[in-house]
Amino acid sequence: VGTDAAGNLIGRREGTQPGLAPLVTGSHCDTVMGGGRFDGILGVLAGLEAAQSLHEGGVLLRHPLEVIDFLSEEPSDYGISCVGSRAFAGTLDAAMLACRNEAGESLAEAMRRIGARPDGLAAAARGPGGIAAFVELHIEQGPVLEREGLPIGVVTDIVGIRRIAFAVTGQPDHAGTTPMDIRRDALVGAARLIDAVHREASAMDGHPHYVVATVGRISMSPNVPNAVPGRVDMVLEVRSNAQAVLDDFPERVMALCHDDFRRLRVGCSAMPLTQTPPTQCDGIVMRAIAQAADRLALPHRALPSGAGHDAMHVAATGPMGMIFIPCLDGRSHCQEEWASKEQVAAGARVLAEALRVLDAR
C-alpha cells in the first residue's frame, strides 16, 4: 500500500504472471458538502473486500490487482474535479495545478500540503495501455434500478457535460410607472428560456439518447422589488451520452425562444464555459460484468451514467467499465443517500467475479 505523486492511495496485490498490466478497481472517498456515505466510498471499500475475498479464498490472479482511492473526485475549491484520476491518466496539466481557491492557494500548493508531489506527476501517470482493465462499483445516483427492481446495472457510457452562460438583456425601469406593454423585462425572457430548456430536454430524452438539462445558477439586476429586471445571467448545464446533443442543444433552445425574445424586446447571448465529452464503456468490460452477474444469478440491465466519475478519466489508460447498484429513492449527494447491505453485497460480489472474468480472458 502506498500513495503516488498525485495523492492517490493505492493497494496492490501481485499477480502470478510477471509483466502483465494491472487490473484496477476503486473510486473515491471525498464527498460533496452534506453528502452521503455511499457515493465513491462504496467503490473503494468493495474493491478492498474483493481483494480480501480473493486472498482468503486462495485465488491467485494472473494480473496484478490494484485498489485505488482517487484524490478529490468531487468538485473542489480550486474549480477542478477528479484530480487524482486526471493525474492517473496524465491529463492533470499545469493550468489546472495553477487554479486557486478563494484564499489564494493553488491546487499544486494544496496537494503539497497533504503530502502529494505535484512536481512529480509524470510518475503517477499510467498513459494508454497502462492498465489491463478498470472496473468501478458505484451507486446509481438515480431511480432506474430501484424502480425496475434490479440489483445490478451494467453501465454503457458516462455522459458528457456542457455548460453555457446565457445573458438575457432588457432594460431596467421603474416597476410602478412602466406600462406592461412597453416593458423590456429580462426576467420574463429568462423564464421563457428556462422553460424551453425543460421542454426540449424532456422531449429529446430517450429518443434515442440520454438527455438532461438544468439551469442551476441565476443572477439578476437590479434585483430589487421596485425595478423591472434589466439583465439576467444564468448557467445552463446539459448532459448527454451523445456529442451531437451537447453540440446542438444550446442553439436549439435559443431558436425555440427567438419569437418570444422578439415580442418581449429582449436580447440573449450565449458564451461557452466548459465541456467534457461522453465516455463509452469498453465492450469487453461490459460483457465481463454481465457474465459475472449471470454467474451469480443476479438480474441486470444496461444503462448510461448521468453523473461523471473517475472512470471517465481512467478510460484513457485502458478498457473501462462500471457496475451500478440501486440507491434508495435514487437519492445522492445528500444525507438520505442509502443502499442496503444486500444491495452492497450484490455489487461487491459482481465486482469480484468480474475481475476474475477479466483476469481469465
Segments predicted by a language model, with ranges:
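Alpha-helical metal-binding/catalytic segments enriched in His/Glu/Asp
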Residues: 25-28, 34-74, 162-168, 179-201, ...
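Flexible, glycine/charged-enriched surface loops at secondary-structure junctions
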Residues: 4, 60-61, 121-125, 177, ...
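Acidic, glycine-rich active-site loops and adjacent beta-strand->loop/helix elements
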Residues: 7-9, 29-32, 65-76, 141, ...
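Acidic/His- and Gly-rich active-site-bordering loop/insert found
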Residues: 1-36, 54
